Amino acid sequence: MKNIPKSGYIKWEPDECLGCSRCLTACAVYHHGAVSPSLSGIVWHDEMQLQKFQLRRPLFCQQCDVPECYFACPLMDEAICIDSANGTRHISIKECTGCGSCVEACPFDEPRINLADIDRKMVAVKCDLCRNREDGPVCVQVCSRHALTLVPKGERL
């Protein structure tokens, strides 16, 4: 098996989260310039309905040590890539065919990858930890309750 570098990940603190979806919106705007939940690298999971309120939580790609999405991709190293510098697993929208193999391979009951229509092309969208952003993940920055934290790769369990 290929030697895969470790990556950091986003940690969510449920006791601090209000479910406001600022993280979701900021992600979509930063990456795609549009306010659209389907364009976010964060998957929004509806937990339950309580009277008039919908309880929701954000789900982030956990940047798995053994990224099943990466190995399932027929265009491995082209459509799903691993950054050699920081280990981040990310998707090349230009190369992705939208086949959904990565979504199916995600080991979580609620997959951390979306399929979205970007410029009339179905592609996979997932958290890439804003890998090219100097200030780190935009979702962490916009969360006023500090419910999101970037756990560096060196602190990964």
Regions found by a protein language model. Name each.
Residues 22-42, 67-85, 101-118, 136-156:
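Iron-sulfur cluster-binding cysteine motifs and their immediate structural context
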Residues 1-13, 149-157:
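Iron-sulfur (Fe-S) cluster-binding modules
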Residues 3-5, 55, 82-85:
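Short glycine-enriched loop/turn motifs at secondary-structure junctions
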Residues 2, 13, 29, 39-61, ...:
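Sequence context of c-type cytochrome heme-c attachment sites
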Residues 59, 64, 107-110, 119-131:
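Short, solvent-exposed interaction modules
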Residues 12-22, 53-56, 64-68, 91-101, ...:
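Flanking scaffold residues of small Cys/His-coordinated metal-binding clusters
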Residues 17, 27, 61, 73, ...:
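Short cysteine-rich clusters marking metal-coordination/redox-active sites
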Residues 50-52, 85-90, 115-124, 131-135:
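Short linker/helix segments within small regulatory modules
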